[in-house]
């Protein structure tokens, strides 16, 4: 295994084989142990008490090939329901609760978009997909996107002009859902940023049309299986952290307390496999994903992307990835940090400038979603990692 020395500046770029993750001390990772101790303590504090930020959480952080923090806090399942009349959570008896562990899978929500984006860039690398090609060249039956000249790049950068979402969960069947997607025109000016789940749904259809394979197969065969991410897949996932007592009026469907079934209503309506949501994973598996991208697309003997195409992913404004967003990246933002958040409480950040990564998975929607999400704990955790680098 290559030594740690020199890995931080290079990130493993250009290596035919990149080192795998291994557990180690903060000092071995080149991180300040005091800051990481505070990171862990704060995650525990935010899962404690009567009204915690999240019922439970898993935090994973490291630098280079060294995994320096892997900690679980709180509960994977704490609540039986949400009481609408009293506006309070209904606690399970202590014996019926399920503790959080570092191996607990989470509903990734929009972190799924990162895997869809990597799958797309893999096809760009192979020459089967053109980044500036028009969607209509691959999906002529998606008449609205074809008529307005929407491009693959616009889907990946959320600049297609498509609205944030459609009520696919209210459609009678798959045929009606597909007809709605095919007929949906941009409502904004193409080239203007507007975050939209529809971009990734159209991209899913492009990928499936180009390859003749379903998205779950593309992700499994092209990303998770080569990297040994055995805990990452589309649901159902029975052992996952619970999400929401999903009921109207605060949600868009009446499904009750969810555990192991995709939380996103549109992904659920689409059968659990969707370009914008549907994956489940663990903190360690996502650390492998981050490490692979930091190492230029390689992990051990596996290579999922070439270094130039990892660069393409992270070229501003980013393909699928958000870049330098302090609202959830804290002080890691500023030198090309990349990442994403998920509605269920998930997030990850990787910083190529310092060869560091942070995965924070929390079930913040258990037992009910907040009206306004609280992103401060995500930013605070990332700031701890940034300071752990600076103080070494």
Q: Where do the PLM segments sit?
A:
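Short, conserved phosphate/pyrophosphate- and ester-handling motifs at nucleotide-, phospho-/glycolipid
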Residues: 32, 113, 282
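Short, gly/Ser/Thr-rich active-site loops of penicillin-recognizing serine hydrolases
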Residues: 84, 295, 309-316, 326, ...
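Glycine-rich phosphate/pyrophosphate-binding beta-alpha loops
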Residues: 272-278, 337-349, 363-368
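A short, well-structured edge-of-sheet supersecondary motif
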Residues: 35, 41-99, 131, 157, ...
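Short, surface-exposed loop or secondary-structure junction motifs
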Residues: 6, 13, 77, 82-88, ...
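Short, contiguous pre-domain boundary segments
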Residues: 15-28
């Amino acid at each position: 295994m290559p030594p740690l020395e020199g890995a931080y500046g290079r990130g493993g770029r250009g290596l035919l084989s990149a080192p795998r993750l291994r557990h180690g001390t903060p000092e071995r990772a080149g991180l300040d142990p005091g800051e990481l101790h505070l990171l862990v303590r704060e995650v525990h504090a935010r899962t404690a008490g009567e009204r915690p930020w999240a019922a439970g959480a898993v935090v994973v952080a490291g630098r280079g090939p060294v995994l320096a923090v892997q900690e679980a806090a709180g509960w994977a399942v704490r609540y039986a329901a949400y009481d609408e009349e009293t506006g309070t959570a209904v606690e399970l008896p202590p014996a019926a609760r399920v503790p959080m562990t570092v191996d607990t899978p989470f509903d990734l929500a929009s972190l799924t978009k990162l895997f869809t984006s990597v799958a797309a860039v893999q096809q760009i690398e192979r020459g089967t997909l053109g980044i500036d090609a028009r969607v209509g060249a691959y999906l002529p039956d998606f008449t609205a996107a074809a008529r307005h000249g929407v491009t693959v790049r616009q889907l990946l950068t959320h600049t297609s002009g498509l609205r944030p979402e459609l009520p696919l969960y209210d459609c009678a069947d798959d045929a009606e859902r597909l007809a709605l997607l095919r007929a949906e025109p941009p409502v904004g000016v193409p080239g203007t940023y507007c975050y939209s789940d529809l971009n990734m749904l159209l991209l899913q259809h492009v990928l499936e049309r180009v390859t003749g394979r379903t998205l779950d197969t593309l992700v499994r065969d092209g990303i998770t299986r080569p990297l040994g991410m055995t805990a990452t897949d589309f649901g159902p996932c029975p052992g996952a952290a619970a999400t929401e007592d999903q009921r109207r009026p605060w949600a868009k469907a009446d499904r009750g307390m969810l555990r192991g079934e995709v939380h996103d209503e549109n992904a659920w309506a689409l059968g659990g496999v969707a370009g914008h949501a549907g994956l489940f994973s663990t903190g360690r598996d996502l650390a492998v994903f981050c490490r692979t991208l930091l190492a230029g697309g390689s992990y051990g003997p596996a290579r999922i992307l070439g270094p130039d195409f990892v660069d393409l992913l992270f070229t501003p404004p980013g393909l699928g990835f958000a870049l330098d967003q302090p609202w959830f990246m804290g002080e890691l933002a500023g030198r090309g940090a990349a990442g994403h958040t998920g509605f269920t409480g998930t997030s990850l950040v990787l910083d190529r400038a310092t060869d560091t990564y942070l995965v924070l998975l929390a079930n913040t929607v258990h037992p009910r979603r907040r009206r306004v999400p609280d992103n401060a704990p995500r930013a605070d955790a990332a700031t701890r990692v940034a300071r752990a680098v600076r103080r070494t």
